[in-house]
Design a protein with these regions (language model features):
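N-terminal helical cap/lid subdomain that shapes the substrate entry/recognition surface
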Residues: 2-108
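Residue-level preference for short coil/turn positions at secondary-structure junctions
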Residues: 1-2, 120
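Substrate-recognition element of Asp-dependent hydrolases with the DxDx(T/V) motif
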Residues: 89-104, 111-143
Length: 144
């Protein structure tokens, strides 16, 4: 039996995720400051409290990070006094800002040559609980 398929996680495998997430969080905070001023400088402890409450009610959200982030934003915006429909629109728009910044990654130097060499011999796949998209990253041609 020979190896036919190799799968990869993305974060911290193909790039260092810490600076990416820090930048994405900063982009979201800056966007929220401009577009949702009632939210103000919400204490991070409040966001962690919302997160804990959501995960207690729906433990499977820990595997659906995009949905979890959207819901945290929605709750924080609602708590800040935005009407539900406005909070939903702001949460989704803010999430899209976060997601765009989250795809501004700096691949490790050896990623392209390694994936190219492996893709010539094996099927390559991605298994991740994150929200990085190989199509948005210009890596889709390596994966099936």
């Amino acid at each position: 039996m020979s190896i036919q398929l190799i799968t990869f996680d993305l974060d911290d495998t193909l790039w260092d995720v810490t600076p990416v997430m820090q930048d994405a969080e900063a982009a979201l905070r800056n966007w929220l400051a401009m577009h949702a001023p009632r939210l103000g400088a919400v204490p991070v402890e409040h966001l962690w409290s919302i997160r804990a409450t959501l995960l207690q009610a729906e433990p499977m959200l820990k595997h659906r990070l995009s949905e979890l982030r959207r819901r945290i934003l929605l709750h924080a915006l609602t708590d800040a006094g935005y009407a539900h429909a406005d909070a939903q629109a702001l949460a989704e728009a803010g999430f899209q800002v976060f997601l765009a910044a989250r795809h501004q990654v700096e691949l490790f130097a050896e990623v392209h040559p390694t994936l190219e060499a492996l893709a010539n011999r094996f099927q390559l796949g991605v298994i991740t609980n994150g929200n990085a998209d190989v199509r948005r990253l210009g890596l889709a041609d390596y994966f099936q």
